[in-house]
Every structure is written in C-alpha cells, then in structure tokens.
Amino acid sequence: MKTLLLTLVVVTIVCLDLGYTIVCHTTATSPISAVTCPPGENLCYRKMWCDVFCSSRGKVVELGCAATCPSKKPYEEVTCCSTDKCNPHPKQRPG
C-alpha cells in the first residue's frame, strides 16, 4: 500500500512539473490558427486598433501569446485571458 501511495505521489509531482501550456489564436500565421504557446507565455491576447482603412475594412486585429498582458496604447483595445482559445478573432477582416 505504501508503494502504491509513493508511486502516486511521484507521478503527481512529475505531471505537475511538466507545466501547463495554453493554446491561443494567432495572427502570426496566415490563415489565423490556434497554436500552443511557448513555455512561460501563459496568456492569450487580442489587440485591436483603427488604421487608415478602418472605415472600409474594420479594425486591425492582432492575436497571440504573451507572458504578460501587452501595454495598451491610447488608440488600442487590449484584452488578455488565460484559457485555451479565449482570444478569437471578432470577425474575419476582408482582403
């Protein structure tokens, strides 16, 4: 019984030591895809802002992984989250 308990403790420690990786949507690839974030980057983010084509194409959207939530500039909307695929693209931007 002690051997079984010790084995379970060791397995638990090994599994916890592997760490958790999060899956985020990213615009670094075309088309937009979901990727497993590198170790240490445990947040998904979505940045949106208007460029010169905003009135015809809509906002520019940047999606990705981050270790810390990116700093927000005055003209940007930034959201961060910490569950798999929690940063979807609000809509596909034309062309």
Curated annotation (Swiss-Prot):
GO terms for cellular component: extracellular region. The keyword Secreted applies. GO terms for molecular function: acetylcholine receptor inhibitor activity; ion channel regulator activity; toxin activity. SUPFAM superfamilies: Snake toxin-like. Coiled coil: none annotated. InterPro entries: Snake_3FTx, Snake_toxin-like_sf, Snake_toxin_con_site, Toxin_cobra-type. Keywords: Acetylcholine receptor inhibiting toxin, Disulfide bond, Ion channel impairing toxin, Neurotoxin, Postsynaptic neurotoxin, Secreted, Signal, Toxin. Disulfide bonds join 24-44, 37-65, 50-54, 69-80, 81-86. Pfam families: Toxin_cobra-type. Its main location: secreted. It is found in: Secreted. Residues 1-21 form the signal peptide. Expressed by the venom gland. It comes from the Eukaryota. Monomer in solution, homodimer in crystal state. Binds with high affinity to muscular (alpha-1/CHRNA1) and neuronal (alpha-7/CHRNA7) nicotinic acetylcholine receptor (nAChR) and inhibits acetylcholine from binding to the receptor, thereby impairing neuromuscular and neuronal transmission. Belongs to the three-finger toxin family. Long-chain subfamily. Type II alpha-neurotoxin sub-subfamily. This is Alpha-bungarotoxin isoform V31.
